[in-house]
Amino acid sequence: MCIRDRAINSTANVLRPSLQIIKTAPGVKTVSAFFLMMVPNCEYGENGVFVFGDCGLCQNPTSEELCVIAKSSADSFKGFTGKEPRVAFLSHSTKGSASHPDVDKVLKALELTKEQYPELIVDGEFQLDAAIVPEVAKTKAPDSEVAGTANVLIYPDLDAGNIGYKLVQRFAKADAYGPITQGLAKPVNDLSRGCTAKD
């Protein structure tokens, strides 16, 4: 197991040698990162436990890359919790409520994920509340098996993911473990320079 600490180093300085030395896992084309989020006193997700992907590495992933991120994040959730992942692709739109190329990217990622990984419980596109709040899901996405129950949240880009995890960490006082790199042949952990001793 390889753990790289960037409490004083940039992500690039940590991941460049990781990619050069460790390489990607067999069959994986996209290396990404996730956060294991543990939100206190929260009934959403898996009793407050979520995986957020990608919040630390892929700046503006394509639909194809989002598909791989979804699969890797689902596997990471299962590996850490032992629970069944329920994957939601996040967007500013829920089930066609808005039209935009950014929404199209997420819809294409969902289509690819369902084709390539039919065993995954996955759906989208969802606004956050539709993904995790059952009462909202009943109104916005009543026919979805994921809406209102998602425990793996796939962000459309790094801006949304990074802002999202930090909002939950700071406002909800959640424990945020990561970014943990996924898709490499060996585990790599890349700590934020804003990390605490507890992290």
Show which residues each predicted segment covers:
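Conserved small/polar residues in nucleotide/adenosyl-binding loops
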Residues: M1-I3
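Anion-binding alpha/beta catalytic cores of soluble intermediary-metabolism enzymes, centered on
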Residues: D5-A147, N151-D199
